[in-house]
Amino acid sequence: MDFIFHEKQEGFLCAQHCLNNLLQGEYFSPVELASIAHQLDEEERMRMAEGGVTSEEYLAFLQQPSENMDDTGFFSIQVISNALKFWGLEIIHFNNPEYQKLGIDPINERSFICNYKQHWFTIRKFGKHWFNLNSLLAGPELISDTCLANFLARLQQQAYSVFVVKGDLPDCEADQLLQIISVEEMDTPKLNGKKLVKQKEHRVYKTVLEKVSEESDESGTSDQDEEDFQRALELSRQETNREDEHLRSTIELSMQGSSGNTSQDLPKTSCVTPASEQPKKIKEDYFEKHQQEQKQQQQQSDLPGHSSYLHERPTTSSRAIESDLSDDISEGTVQAAVDTILEIMRKNLKIKGEK
C-alpha cells in the first residue's frame, strides 16, 4: 500500500508521526512542534504572572518542567490540537457527552487520534476504507467497517483516550485512489516495535552490568557478589518483561482491526502528498504570525527592571537554544577576534619585509 503515507516510529516522536500520518505528508517537524509547545508555555507563564512575578505560585511554576514537551520528543494533546487548528481541524474527545448525544456512527467519521500515556497514533479513512496508521506497525493496517466500533471500544477499555478529528483533511493520492479501488483483504503488517523492545532490554542489562561492575571494582568479587548479580539480572528481566508485555499487548490491540491475511493486487505508486510549496507557505506564515504575537505579548508583560527571559521555564525549544547562542557571541568577542587576526597579519608582513 505504497500510496498511503506512513511514518514509522523513530525514537519517541510518535506525536509527529501521528500528525503527519493523519495529514498524509511531512507537514510537521520536531522543531515546529517544539515552537508550538514553547508558545503554549509562554502563554501559560503570562497567565501565571498576572498574580505577581514574586508570588510563591509563580516562582514554583517556573521551576516546573514544561507540560507540553520534554527532551524525549513527547508532545502534549494541547500541542497536537494547536498544530491541527491552523489546518482548520479540531479534535473532540470521543466520550464527550455533547458528542455522544449526536449518536454519530464511527464509520461516518473521517479520522481518529488515539493516545495512551506517551504514545499517539492515527486511524484514518481513505475513500471507503479505514486504516490503522500506528507508527509502531511496519505499514498501514486495514480495518473493516464492522470491526471499527469494536476496535475503538477495546482501545478505551485499555485506557486509551480516543479523539475525533473534525474538519476537512488535505487532499491526498490515497484518498483519491481508494475512492475507486476496492480493498477486500491485505496482509497484516509486521510489528515495528520489536526492535524498540530489544533496545530497551539491552539498556536495562547494560545498566545492571555497569552498576555491578562498579561495585565489584570497589570491594572485590565473591560468591555473594555473583549471587547478587544474578538476582539483579533476574529482577531486571522480570521488570522488562512486564513492560514488554504491556507494549506487546498495546501493539496487538492496535492490530485487531485486521480482516484477513491476503492482499489484493493494487497499483503501487509513490506518495505525492509530502508538503508541497503551498503547505510550506502556510506553515511559514503560521509560525511567523505566532512569533510576532509572542514578541508583542512579551513587550506587554515586561515590568520595569525585569526581562521576560529571566522568567522562562526550563525548555528545550530550538528558539531558546538559538537565543542562547546569539547572546554568547557579543560584539566585544567579534572585535577581539578581528584584532587578533590583524595583529598576526602585521607580524607576518614585518617578517617578510625584513627578509
From Swiss-Prot:
It comes from Homo sapiens. It is found in: Nucleus. Residues 278-293 have a biased composition (Basic and acidic residues). Coiled coil: none annotated. Its EC number is 3.4.19.12. This is Ataxin-3-like protein. InterPro entries: Ataxin-3, Josephin, UIM_dom. GO terms for biological process: negative regulation of TORC1 signaling; positive regulation of ERAD pathway; proteasome-mediated ubiquitin-dependent protein catabolic process; protein deubiquitination; protein quality control for misfolded or incompletely synthesized proteins.
